From Swiss-Prot:
The protein's role, per its UniProt record: Synthesizes alpha-1,4-glucan chains using ADP-glucose.
EC number: 2.4.1.21
Protein name: Glycogen synthase
Keywords: Glycogen biosynthesis, Glycosyltransferase, Transferase
SUPFAM superfamilies membership: UDP-Glycosyltransferase/glycogen phosphorylase
Matching InterPro entries: Glyco_trans_1, GS/SS, Starch_synth_cat_dom
Domain of life, source organism: Bacteria
Pathway entry: Glycan biosynthesis; glycogen biosynthesis
Family the UniProt entry places it in: Belongs to the glycosyltransferase 1 family. Bacterial/plant glycogen synthase subfamily.
Reaction catalysed by this enzyme: [(1->4)-alpha-D-glucosyl](n) + ADP-alpha-D-glucose = [(1->4)-alpha-D-glucosyl](n+1) + ADP + H(+)
Length: 487
């Protein structure tokens, strides 16, 4: 019987405390699934202005540029029976702002955060077996452990995992950040932190963590190629033996159409007619005519990664059909303005809400018939899993986690759970939507089977947490083997 592990998950955002994207959902859900398997799990994140329910623990000094900054350590907890502790690193200068990222001093802000986390653990007397880091904001932690704490007995047996949620966001900064990190110029070489004339926090995490993973098996393979590797494919190929792909999950208690209080009407796979009542409620909410036509939904950041150029290219021919389209998202001005113009052009068929509204998102999952994710690349994707749960049939591009989770009905008769295309071309997307519409309109029995298969699928966190558990133990063995080699 393996002994329970002590795990610290470090993330720049954790739902429901602070969220900009899917990383927050992962950081809020995975700890609960690990705790359910008997492990002692704690979480660390910055204390942003919007995080309210916290208790003061202590002040700790953190060295920055030769002077001392104060890290105020506060504690909250994740909702749920386990009450998992969340440690919040507070500093008014660095984190009391309107947003979470995108500031000129992000390099210093998250350098401070990473140093503060490693200063906090001895004070807490919480000695983790695993520090699980997530995305570029936490990349310096594996580096600091190997370079700054290599002789610190407190961390002697601690292994690090570094999870890449999206390789496109790399945390690259000017060379002078090395001084703030208290690192010599020796680190500004391609074999270490130098990345095309800058310093990369993402590269630090990939290079110095004991094991690295990303959030689907397919994406773990894709990022080792020039097409998807964002100029880090060479390093990732070098670390291929230490690179894993573990699919994210979704919280099946939160995302359950039978109990979701945000819905107009609750339903399950045995009462699919009630999904139609949610469609009518969505049409009324979005000021569309209440008609029995197929409703397509899209919930997305409005950025080029999400395949919106393909969608824009086919909207005119698509909207000539007898259907409706509901879009929720925010992002690049170009796409916000483009879709807002189409909303005016097709006002009886198309509804657009710019922004993020979590309640409306649930109404779209419950009210739409077809859910679109035509992504150029998609490390994992949660939207397609949620749409399956709510009986909305996904139309997706076969890439990353979308390929790992969605099987095309026509390629896999009797087991398919959606519709997929591979060529990144507008016509391929339109043809695939039309295939889905044909089944919806002309094969209603097959469509109901498709809905039920999706609703019965298991993309809960339990299986994914088991894979992380295996990876944690593997990282510990790797760490101990390295210690004995040195010792």
């Amino acid at each position: 019987m393996n002994k329970p592990l002590k795990i610290l998950l470090v993330s720049p955002e954790v739902a429901p405390l602070a969220k900009t994207g899917g990383l927050a959902d992962v950081a809020g859900s995975l700890p609960k699934a690990l705790a359910a398997k008997g492990h002692e799990v704690r979480v660390a994140m910055p204390r942003y202005r919007q995080v309210k329910e916290v208790n003061y623990l202590t002040d700790l000094p953190v060295e920055m540029d030769g002077s001392l900054e104060t890290a105020v350590i506060r504690q909250g907890k994740l909702p749920g029976e386990a009450g998992i502790p969340v440690y919040l690193i507070d500093n008014y200068k660095f984190f009391y702002r309107d947003g979470m990222y995108g500031y000129g001093d992000d390099a210093a802000r998250f350098n401070f955060f990473c140093k503060a986390v490693l200063s906090m653990l001895p004070w807490l007397e919480f000695q983790p077996d695993i520090i699980h880091c997530n995305d570029w904001q936490t990349g310096p932690i594996p580096l600091f452990l190997k370079v700054k704490h290599e002789d610190n007995p407190f961390y002697r047996e601690t292994a690090t995992i570094y999870t890449i949620h999206n390789l496109q966001y790399q945390g690259t900064f000017p060379r002078n950040i090395l001084k703030t990190m208290a690192l010599s110029e020796e680190f500004f070489v391609p074999e270490r932190l130098e990345f095309y004339g800058q310093v990369s926090y993402m590269k630090a995490g990939i290079l110095y963590a004991d094991l690295v993973n990303t959030v689907s098996k397919k994406y773990a393979l894709e990022i080792q190629t020039p097409e998807y590797g964002e100029r880090l494919d060479g390093l990732l190929r070098k670390r291929a033996a230490d690179l894993r792909g573990i699919l994210n999950g979704i919280d099946y208690e939160e995302f359950d159409p039978a109990t979701d209080r945000r819905l107009a009407v609750n339903y399950d796979a045995d009462h699919l007619e009630k999904k139609g009542e949610n469609k009518a409620a969505l049409q009324r909410e979005m000021e569309l005519p209440v008609r029995d036509v197929p409703v397509l939904g899209l919930i997305s950041r409005l950025v080029s990664q999400k395949g919106l150029d393909l969608l824009a290219a086919i909207l005119d021919p698509l909207m000539q059909q007898d259907l409706q389209f509901v879009l929720l998202g925010s992002g690049e001005d170009y796409y916000q303005q483009l879709f807002s113009r189409y909303k005016v052009k097709y006002r009886d068929k198309m509804a657009v809400k710019i922004g993020f509204d979590p309640v409306l998102a649930q109404h779209i999952y419950a009210g739409c018939d077809i859910f679109l994710m035509p992504s150029r690349f998609e490390p994992c994707g949660l939207g397609q899993m949620i749409s399956l749960r709510y009986g909305a049939v996904p139309v997706v591009r076969a890439t990353g986690g979308l390929e790992d989770t969605i099987k095309d009905l026509h390629q896999y008769p009797g087991v398919g759970n959606g519709f997929t295309f591979r060529d990144y071309q507008p016509q391929a997307l339109l043809d695939t939507i039309n295939r889905a519409l044909h089944v919806y309109r002309h094969e209603p029995g097959e469509w109901r089977k498709l809905m039920r298969r999706g609703m019965a699928a298991d993309f809960s966190w339990s299986a994914s947490a088991g894979h992380y558990e295996e990876m944690y133990r593997e990282a510990l063995e790797k760490r101990r083997a390295a210690m004995f080699k040195v010792g």
